[in-house]
């Protein structure tokens, strides 16, 4: 029997953290963070990490598990999340994944799996490379590789290219999970306004101090490349004004939110929930309860 997993996804600033905590409390669950930046210790504000009070309200995993000097990959996330899901289930609780890093979550819950640990790391690295390509470039690669993909589905093209590259080492096996995807969204302008307001709140909470520490101590770290950090480096070097840096964070965050929604819409079988819609919580509760009772 497959393990049932609730998955709360959506663009940045849409309200995933609050919903995840609500569901964990209501359905005896524990939260696994599906965010590639929240793994880093000391980077609390810019990553919009759940506050100490929020983390006390529900058990959270995969937050503060890496130093900023360390890298983090989809392969590491998959390995650690699998172990956590098994542990959470063994204690009679419900695994709830909350985050916006689509590649990590999809790699865990869907797709092909390799037998060897080294091969698994290689295929996830290759998948990340393919994900950076445009639809047009992927279709060109598929044609060059002689792939015939029905409907030119981006996800099928990527899987086909993975099969072509890794051949018999790549097995089309079931993931062992039965996910219920709850994708939060909102009207674009409402979401963009919320993003802008959150950046302002981050600044008031001390984001610049957090960025300054990272810039002084570990400017070359993978963690420093995240949105909310890298935009301030030109300001700290005297190249742009603070207002320009803040505006760049807001703009990049809005663009990231748009990319996230495109990812979830095109590559994962998700149900969308408009957070500003009346009674949206009741709809979500009903979906979860029907899923768990099935």
UniProtKB/Swiss-Prot annotation:
InterPro entries: Dimethylallyltransferase (IPR039657), IPT (IPR018022), P-loop_NTPase (IPR027417). The record marks 101, 127 as: Interaction with substrate tRNA. It is an enzyme of class 2 (transferase). One of its GO terms (biological process) is tRNA modification. Its EC number is 2.5.1.75. It comes from the Bacteria. Its cofactor is Mg(2+). Substrate binds at residues 12-17. The keyword Transferase applies. Residues 35-38 are annotated as: Interaction with substrate tRNA. GO terms for molecular function: ATP binding; tRNA dimethylallyltransferase activity. It catalyses: adenosine(37) in tRNA + dimethylallyl diphosphate = N(6)-dimethylallyladenosine(37) in tRNA + diphosphate. The keyword tRNA processing applies. Keywords: ATP-binding, Magnesium, Nucleotide-binding, Transferase, tRNA processing. ATP binds at residues 10-17. Catalyzes the transfer of a dimethylallyl group onto the adenine at position 37 in tRNAs that read codons beginning with uridine, leading to the formation of N6-(dimethylallyl)adenosine (i(6)A). Belongs to the IPP transferase family. Monomer. NCBIfam families: miaA. HAMAP family: IPP_trans. This is tRNA dimethylallyltransferase. The gene is miaA.
